[in-house]
Structures are given as C-alpha cells and as structure tokens.
Amino acid sequence: SDVCSSDLVEIAEAFDYAHELGMATILWCYLRNSDFKKDGVDYHAAADLTGQADRLGVTIKADIVKQKLPVNNGGFTAIGFGKTDERMYTQLASEHPIDLCRYQVSNGYMGRVGLINSGGESHGSSDLRDAVVTAVVNKRAGGMGLISGRKAFQKPMNKGVELLNAIQDVYLDPAVTIA
C-alpha cells in the first residue's frame, strides 16, 4: 500500500518500546495483495513470499512471527517481482510441506525468531487431522508452535479441548523431531 513503509516504521517503534518495557512482540505476517493471484494460482501462502514477509517481521524485531502454513512456492517468479535464484526452488527447497515450512523458519534467522503457524479455518470433520498435520509439519521444520483458534473454539468444548490436547501431544512428543 501507499503507507506500507510508514506502517513498518510505526510497528518497529512500537516493538522497540515494548522491548524497553520487557514485553515480547508477536507479529502476524500475513500477505494481502490481489496481485499475488496469478493465472488461477493463489500465492498468498507461497513459501518464498511468506518467508519474505517473515523476514520483514524479524527485521523490525518481532520476537515471534505468525504465518500461514505454506502450500506452494514460486510466488516471486510467478508475479515477476523480486530478485531470485533458481536454486531457491530447486536445490534449497522441494514441494514437501516440511521443506516449504522450513523456508519460513530460515527467514527468521534460522529459527532464532520463532515461527508459529496458523491453524486455519475450520473445515468440520477434518479439523483434528488437519491440526495434527500442521503441528507435525511446523515442529519438524523447526517451528515453535501452532495457533488454533477457529478450529478449536468453533465447536463444542470437549471437541475443542481434544483438538488442543492433540496439538500439545505433538509438541511434547520427543519422537517428533526436526526432519
């Protein structure tokens, strides 16, 4: 947007002040740009574009960044923006969900700034499975957590608690390790 640069400066100043007060900062680094849809493909959750958004977040000193789990890659080349190298799509990443998420983690100083992925919208009967898969992908990629609001809180309490417990089980399980 026309005010993007001033918004980033304001947020960076707010984060500096929060840190002076001893507070942690968490930034939702979601993309919002109609140009990120090209030839019928939506790149709002592309690993390269979301990774760059995460990088902006850590540059302005977010302690944790929240990002959608990537579902594809190649956003920069598709929209014809940014300086890229073919190796970032061939040698440094694959289409595997863990590799795509790892690309996000690497844009946060190789995980020094924590990545939490969003749980996404509720789809009903597949929510438990989807949440566990997202948690496993995030943890195996080096991420630090998952926020699951709608999936957990738009259902009866016992089902929401079951979903949250399943997510916790992933992060507490020592057998689920970095890939």
For each predicted feature, which ranges?
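Conserved anion-binding
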Residues: 8-90
